[in-house]
């Protein structure tokens, strides 16, 4: 009888545990769908506000060129559309920079549950970053994108050259002096693991070269003077010693300088 009572208690515990887990999943899905809807609506608002300077320029030129010849009017309106597009990109970058600067979290190496305030805050920052990404793509490398990354907390040393629009979570990335980050390099200081978001800062030293399309994963440290070959994937929590050349998938030592 004692055994049967214990067995029934065990079954009730398992049933309750499964029920709680299902409820947590449902709560997460409801929260996710609600926040996604808010984000979709906000996207239109964000891009719409940033489009206002370009639209204002277009309307002024359109209204003030009514008496011009068709050729002159077409040229001026065409220029207003082109300049308006550039104004939209710059406005998007600067508005996103301001909001991200205000909202960026002060975190280091940490694990947080998917359903947490930190995760939601990180998700919204990710959305802001994605709104700016199409504009960053057309602006790298330039002082504009350096300003953007720095305003989001990224450390970029003197004389460094950042040519990638794929630096995620910039507030967890540190780039030393006289370092070159090639085009399409992916730098990602976070990953999803066991129902948690894992954040691990990435540090790239001085006088480094990260080649075209390479990927640097969470927790990596690239020593001074190191070279990461094009298309290489550096596994998470890897330390590349100073002065070494790494390449391949996964990246391994090729040679020492």
Describe the role of every protein-language-model region.
Residues 100, 165, 251:
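Residue-level marker of positions within ordered structural domains that often coincide
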Residues 2-5, 9, 183-190, 194-257:
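Glycine-rich hexapeptide-repeat left-handed beta-helix
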Residues 97, 106-110, 153, 182, ...:
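Glycine-centered flexibility motif
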Residues 1-150, 257:
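Terminal amphipathic alpha-helical/low-complexity segments used for targeting or macromolecular assembly
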Residues 132-188, 194-195, 200, 214, ...:
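Left-handed beta-helix
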Residues 23, 72, 129, 177, ...:
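Glutamate identity and glutamate-enriched acidic tracts
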Residues 108, 112, 165, 177, ...:
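Flexible domain-boundary/linker segments
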Residues 123-125, 155, 202:
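A short alpha-helix capping/helix-coil boundary motif
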């Amino acid at each position: 009888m004692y055994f049967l009572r214990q067995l029934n208690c065990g079954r009730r515990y398992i049933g309750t545990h499964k029920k709680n887990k299902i409820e947590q999943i449902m709560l997460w899905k409801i929260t996710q769908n609600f926040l996604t809807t808010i984000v979709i609506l906000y996207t239109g608002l964000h891009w719409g506000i940033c489009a206002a300077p370009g639209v204002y320029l277009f309307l002024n030129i359109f209204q003030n060129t009514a008496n011009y010849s068709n050729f002159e009017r077409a040229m001026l309106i065409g220029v207003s559309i082109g300049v308006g597009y550039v104004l939209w990109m710059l406005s998007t970058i600067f508005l996103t920079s301001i909001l991200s600067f205000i909202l960026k979290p002060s975190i280091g190496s940490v694990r947080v549950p998917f359903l947490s305030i930190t995760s939601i805050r990180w998700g919204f920052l990710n959305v802001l970053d994605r709104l700016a990404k199409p504009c960053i793509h057309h602006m790298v490398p330039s002082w504009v994108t350096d300003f953007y990354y720095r305003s989001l907390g990224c450390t970029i040393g003197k004389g460094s050259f950042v040519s990638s629009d794929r630096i995620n979570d910039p507030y967890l990335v540190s780039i030393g002096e006289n370092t070159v980050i090639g085009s399409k390099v992916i730098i990602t200081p976070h990953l999803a693991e066991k129902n948690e978001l894992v954040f691990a800062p990435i540090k790239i030293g001085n006088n480094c070269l990260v080649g075209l399309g390479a990927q640097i994963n969470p927790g990596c440290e690239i020593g001074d003077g190191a070279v990461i070959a094009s298309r290489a994937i550096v596994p998470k929590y890897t330390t590349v010693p100073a002065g070494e050349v790494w390449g391949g998938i996964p990246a391994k030592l090729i040679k020492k300088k």
